Design a protein with these regions (language model features):
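Signature for phosphate-centric chemistry
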Residues: 1-121, 130-227
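Structured beta-strand/turn binding interfaces of compact recognition modules in eukaryotic regulators
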Residues: 127
Length: 227
């Protein structure tokens, strides 16, 4: 990528969401003569959210507090960390995320609302994770309006090991949490050791006392940027 065209916000991985300028690779064509849409089934991802409780973003404040407790003091551009307070939420949708799902509901009503038959029971499904439940509720609010509970039954599926839940495949796959599925994590750690070495050295130059600042700390600090 040419430096003149470089955008930090486009190089942060999955967050924040940036639409593909060339679309999804699926071309839109009109329906063939004599055909019509009679049903619409949708699987929708949750909206923009705050970090999960176990994410490096959420654990970074505790690490800063640990360093300060061990006598480390931050200087220069990092001096703000001496009195910094973490103010992000955890797990739930951001205000933007709620708006995204509401807007999606409105758009889908205009596109497919004519298919809705009030005499036919309609069921929507989500899971017990806060952001999932909030996403479903905001989508249905956009689709049907504030009285959406009169139009659709929202089934909330338990997202825990041992429960049948097609919306949470990780709970049904025995390999999800073992080393067999962790190759990506290993590769990421190896890459961090390379590309963050110089940055870690620069961070240490802005610390006094007992700065046991690691490459992992630099990475965790970096993960806060999208938020």
């Amino acid at each position: 990528m040419e430096l003149a065209l470089f955008s930090t916000s486009l190089t942060m991985g999955p967050r924040p969401y940036m639409p593909n300028p060339s679309g999804f690779g699926v071309k839109e064509y009109p329906l063939p003569p004599g055909t019509n849409i009679t049903q619409m089934h949708m699987v929708h991802r949750h909206g923009s959210r705050y970090p999960t409780s176990s994410a490096s973003v959420a654990t970074f404040p505790d690490r800063v507090a640990e360093l300060l407790g061990n006598g480390t003091r931050f200087t220069g551009d990092l001096a703000f960390l001496n009195s910094w307070e973490y103010q992000l939420g955890k797990e739930e949708l951001t205000a933007l995320g709620r708006q995204q799902l509401f807007d999606s509901g409105v758009l889908n009503w205009f596109n497919y609302g004519r298919l809705y038959d009030p005499s036919s029971p309609l069921i929507a499904r989500t899971t017990t994770q806060v952001r999932m439940l909030q996403s479903a509720e905001n989508f249905l609010n956009g689709f049907f309006g504030p009285n959406w509970t009169k139009n659709v039954t929202l089934k909330v599926l338990t997202e825990e090991t041992g429960f049948k839940n097609p919306l949470a495949g990780d709970k049904a796959c025995p390999n999800n949490d073992n080393d067999r599925s962790a190759a990506g994590d290993w590769a990421s750690t190896q890459w961090q050791e390379r590309y963050l070495k110089s940055a870690t050295d620069r961070f240490r130059q802005s610390m006094t006392g007992n700065p046991n600042w690691t490459i992992e700390d630099t990475y965790n600090a970096q993960t806060m940027c999208p938020y």
